[in-house]
Amino acid sequence: MNTNLAREEVVDVVDNVIPNIHALENTEVSNENILKRQSPYRYIKRFMDVILATIALVVLSPIFLIIAIAIKIESKGPVFFKHTRIGKNGKIIKLYKFRSMVINAEELIKSFTPEQMKEYKENYKLTNDPRITKIGKFLRKTSLDELPQLLNIIKGDLSIIGPRPVVTDELKKYGANTEKFLSVTPGLTGYWAANGRSCTTYEQRMQMELYYIDNLSLKMDIKVFF
């Protein structure tokens, strides 16, 4: 893809979901106000999370089985993968995912080219990651690799809608907004994930996640979901 065209696409996506992204840098909603707003909202949201996640697990159980078989056929190793993330109030959580990489994925980071390493350090992912299996590419493209996180929702680690959980190095990028980011339960999907997940910079991702938190409401969740 032409570099200039790619940049234009990023700008278009962000401008469409946040009319004036630069204005967000000066938008401050106190953590106290966010917590007050969560009081009735969080109980309704938690109830809906448990009900919808339980129904989804039952309905999607045949798909779970098909994916598990496909993973085992293509490569040796476990079907599921647990990834450490930071949840609400800084709690360490283990997210469940269908394994989409080869089993020695961490070791292969050492063989990245300088360009790949630069991209990985900046975005915590690669556009064309050589460690991803064939079935893994399909699972990631369709987000089916994250279906096991329905279990995390039932446990209370995640909500259906919320900022995507991050690792420690990513959290550092939030700087003065770290406390605000950690004040809400992370989600299976969210405002950023639904509106430009694959074509935004990390700075734009953070602004979109904080925009969601500043506008926390059932109305916002419905907007993201649909």
For the regions a protein language model found, what residue spans apply to each?
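Acidic active-site catalytic centers that drive phospho-/nucleotidyl reactions
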Residues: D49, D145-Q149, E209, D221
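Short, glycine-rich, amphipathic interfacial segments at transmembrane boundaries or analogous
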Residues: I18, F81-P130, T189-E209
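A short, structured surface patch at a secondary-structure boundary
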Residues: E122-V184, F225
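Short glycine/proline-rich turn/loop motifs
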Residues: E28-Q38, P114-E119, D129-I132
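Hydrophobic alpha-helical segments characteristic of transmembrane helices
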Residues: I18-N26, L147-I153, A194
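A hydrophobic, helix-centered structural microdomain
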Residues: K36-E107, L218, K223-F226
